[in-house]
């Protein structure tokens, strides 16, 4: 079963890097993006600003919604209103029969998608602003990974399946290509994905690993923008499926304007520990790569991207035990911010302070501020602070009123 991982509440434990090809250097710039779209246009429907969804948390810029996990069969869905600085309970969910798939929002309604009974039952629960809750089953497998104000979308494998918020209608279109490799994120009203371009179809099944590897050695990984409204793709760039330097790994972090941002990590081949992190961007209009910022050290480290209204704004480039290195997309400046690393997660948990969690529409940033305990399990306590003050090293927080039973 395909599941997306928690990106927000577990930020302290994440390393956002995944193995991928090497990025071309600025001197070896790729050609500008092709403008020709591939695929047969389907009947168009409205598509807004797409957001990628994950199983346990959602952020809108004005609020965040998350599922807590304390080991009980019944757990709450909590909403944190940034303007009020208060976290409240929306409803309880039954984890004894529900496996979280995604949380998303349209208008003022929060939608919680889940499956059950060995992935044979698929459903979503609508949580209305008046507090009412409505559970609706879905007639076929549906694991949505994107949403906008009009619909939820399951884009994977060979198809794009769309669930209309107003009508509840489920429609499916075959993707206009084969050999989907990965789905990376939303870029406005389109989805950035990669597909494998090879001279021969990829060998399938057990026992064909060597043959598959041989085909991939001579294949390309092509980055495309997929438009779910018209069921077409536009090529952005391609590169060898396997990088020349196997000790480099790359992860897509987000977009801002015409630029796509990637984090590139150089690792120690023996220990796989990161030695240097570099933030690079690809300009879709010019077709050129640019190195934005880099940092190096001796600690294990990944990238943590933070977006607002869908666009990348801030990146944690490096993390030591007591200092974060951040890079601002807006002004190109680099900042060193103190923080306290999380220590343990039980009753004796300490630290977990001043790590960024989310950006808010009113110019603040949500950060960790120690712990709150629910059913004896430690969960992050939050606080809010002006973004400029945070980057300057201030800790003049406004504490969030956390929900507890």
Annotate each PLM feature.
Residues 46-71, 101-115, 144-156, 185-203, ...:
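Short beta-strand elements that form the blades of beta-propeller/WD-repeat-like
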Residues 39, 44-45, 72-94, 116-138, ...:
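Surface-exposed loop/turn elements that mediate protein-protein interactions on large endomembrane-trafficking
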Residues 14-16:
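C-terminal motif of bacterial Sec signal peptides marking the signal peptidase cleavage site
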Residues 18-20:
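Bacterial signal peptide processing site
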Residues 245-251, 256, 263, 268-277, ...:
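Intrinsically disordered, low-complexity segments enriched in Gly and acidic/Ser/Thr residues
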Residues 1-8:
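Positively charged n-region of N-terminal signal peptides that target proteins for export
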Residues 51-57, 96-106, 138-149, 177-188, ...:
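Repeated scaffold domains used in trafficking and secretory/extracellular systems
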Residues 25-57:
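Post-signal peptide N-terminal segment of mature Sec-exported envelope proteins
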């Amino acid at each position: 079963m395909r599941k997306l991982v928690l990106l927000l509440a577990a930020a302290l434990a994440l390393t956002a890097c995944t193995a991928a090809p090497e990025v071309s250097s600025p001197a070896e710039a790729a050609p500008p993006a092709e403008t020709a779209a591939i695929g047969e246009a389907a009947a168009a429907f409205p598509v807004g600003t797409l957001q990628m969804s994950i199983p346990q948390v959602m952020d809108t810029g004005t609020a965040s919604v998350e599922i807590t996990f304390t080991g009980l069969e019944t757990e709450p869905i909590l909403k944190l209103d940034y303007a009020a600085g208060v976290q409240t309970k929306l409803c309880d969910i039954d984890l004894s029969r529900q496996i979280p798939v995604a949380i998303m929002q349209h208008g003022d309604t929060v939608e919680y998608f889940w499956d059950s009974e060995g992935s044979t039952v698929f459903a979503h629960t609508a949580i209305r602003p008046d507090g009412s809750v409505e559970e609706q089953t879905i007639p076929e497998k549906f694991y949505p990974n994107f949403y906008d104000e009009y619909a939820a979308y399951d884009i994977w494998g060979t198809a794009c399946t769309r669930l209309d918020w107003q009508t509840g209608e489920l429609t499916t279109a075959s993707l206009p290509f084969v050999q989907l490799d990965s789905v990376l994120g939303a870029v406005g009203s389109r989805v950035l994905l990669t597909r494998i371009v090879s001279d021969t179809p990829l060998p399938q099944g057990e026992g064909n690993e060597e043959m598959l590897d041989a085909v991939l050695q001579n294949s390309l990984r092509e980055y495309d923008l997929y438009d779910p409204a018209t069921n077409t793709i536009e090529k952005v760039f391609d590169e060898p499926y396997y990088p020349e330097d196997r000790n480099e790994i790359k992860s897509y972090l987000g977009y801002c304007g015409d630029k796509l941002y990637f984090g590139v990590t150089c690792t120690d081949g023996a220990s796989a520990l990161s030695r240097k992190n570099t933030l690079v961007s690809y300009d879709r209009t010019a077709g050129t790569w640019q190195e934005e910022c880099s940092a190096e050290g001796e600690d294990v480290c990944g990238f943590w991207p933070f977006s607002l209204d869908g666009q990348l704004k801030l990146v944690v480039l490096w993390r030591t035990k007591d200092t974060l290195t951040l890079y601002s997309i807006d002004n190109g400046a680099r900042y060193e911010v103190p923080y306290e690393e999380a220590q343990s997660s039980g009753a004796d948990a300490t630290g977990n302070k001043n790590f960024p969690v989310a950006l808010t529409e009113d110019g603040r940033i949500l950060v960790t501020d120690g712990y709150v305990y629910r059913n004896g399990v430690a969960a992050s306590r939050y606080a809010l602070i002006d973004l400029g003050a945070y980057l300057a090293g201030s800790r003049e927080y406004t504490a969030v009123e956390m929900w507890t039973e």
